[in-house]
Amino acid sequence: MAKSNSKDIVLIGAGVLSTTFGSMLKEIEPDWNIHVYERLDRPAIESSNERNNAGTGHAALCELNYTVLQPDGSIDIEKAKVINEEFEISKQFWGHLVKSGSIENPREFINPLPHISYVRGKNNVKFLKDRYEAMKAFPMFDNIEYTEDIEVMKKWIPLMMKGREDNPGIMAASKIDEGTDVNFGELTRKMAKSIEAHPNATVQFNHEVVDFEQLSNGQWEVTVKNRLTGEKFKQVTDYVFIGAGGGAIPLLQKTGIPESKHLGGFPISGQFLACTNPQVIEQHDAKVYGKEPPGTPPMTVPHLDTRYIDGQRTLLFGPFANVGPKFLKNGSNLDLFKSVKTYNITTLLAAAVKNLPLIKYSFDQVIMTKEGCMNHLRTFYPEARNEDWQLYTAGKRVQVIKDTPEHGKGFIQFGTEVVNSQDHTVIALLGESPGASTSVSVALEVLERNFPEYKTEWAPKIKKMIPSYGESLIEDEKLMRKIRKQTSKDLELGYYEN
């Protein structure tokens, strides 16, 4: 693709991934024309919404599924290092947006919050202690604390310790104070507003992309429908970026590119218990993750989270899975069935055969009553009362199912997946956690994979936004500490000030 002074790019969806990519693109190529189309009436209504995302501030500080017990008994923390670095990269970009004036008032979307891991039982306690020792030895996590003392835990997680005094059992906890809670809905709204203000960008709500056709010159003709009037129009563009969350797979299929063929999706809703009693909410001030039950997928890790929503402190426990055919919370009951094609049906069937435990888990979760959910909560908070908690359905995640040389047909991919056409004109983001927390790294991956001819030109611009770009926070301890101190200042977190 030959370079020119100006290109057109269509961004589908006004969630955190599209707005992150758009915010980055308008800074490195201010002359490009950005067209954002969102089918709903405002940004961040689906999975990016603060009431819909399952967890926030994923930095591998407390999420035990990022540190894996090996057959020899050791703990592999490599994935935790990567996730932590990616979150540090996100914080740098957000800090840049604040410093440049693109967004304001960072404490409206990010707040300091301790991250705590909590386990019960002899084997889990051994795992947590071994994890602590492995992480403590690495500079990224050397501020981690560990205890098996119930008196210390009463100070860290007083609400969870209530009712355990007579029979505490075997338990342990680890803590890193320098964690965060991120309101991705508010962050997304701020970035969307900033994109709207850009002279070469348009953000149109109630506009749904319904079809694609690639022209002979390599450009794409994108058909857009105004959902209020029913009128359709065509937008010609050089690039198409599909950041539409659960709606990405059907849109990718409509492009007809070969890379869309052996892909499918398995939609899962998250359900949470939300506390309605302010007196209970005030007694918990942390993000506390447990360990997933044996034989269940990583999405099942239970956590009791302090979250800041609409400027108010809230308390959520979950997730509980709720399977249904919709790919989006505001989608159609036909979404799943329409996504089944002749070219991916064997992929989907293979996934069903290979993942019977996941299917059983999902079915068990669907039939679980509120009382069943409350019983799970009481393993964290023994004195939880039914009247203080309300069960609600969060957003949709669509687990990517694909064929791979390594795993064969029907492999379920956890995490975020970037799919692009061979000519790099179509880019789609599929999947889920830790998507939002690592959204900036995902945007960088999109840029590097799909715009290689701009790499040299863009590198200094990216480094201005993300000072660690091109360097490793995992390998360079001095740089890592410098970056953390700077982002804490930029985002008004109050860490590392001594």
Swiss-Prot record:
**What keyword terms does UniProt attach to this protein?**
FAD, Flavoprotein, Oxidoreductase, Tricarboxylic acid cycle
- Name any cofactors this protein relies on: FAD
BP-aspect Gene Ontology terms: tricarboxylic acid cycle
Query: Which pathway does it take part in?
Result: Carbohydrate metabolism; tricarboxylic acid cycle; oxaloacetate from (S)-malate (quinone route): step 1/1
Query: Which terms does the record give in the GO molecular function aspect?
Result: 2-hydroxyglutarate dehydrogenase activity; L-malate dehydrogenase (quinone) activity
Stretch forming the signal peptide: none
Q: Which gene encodes it?
A: mqo2
- Record protein name field: Probable malate:quinone oxidoreductase 2
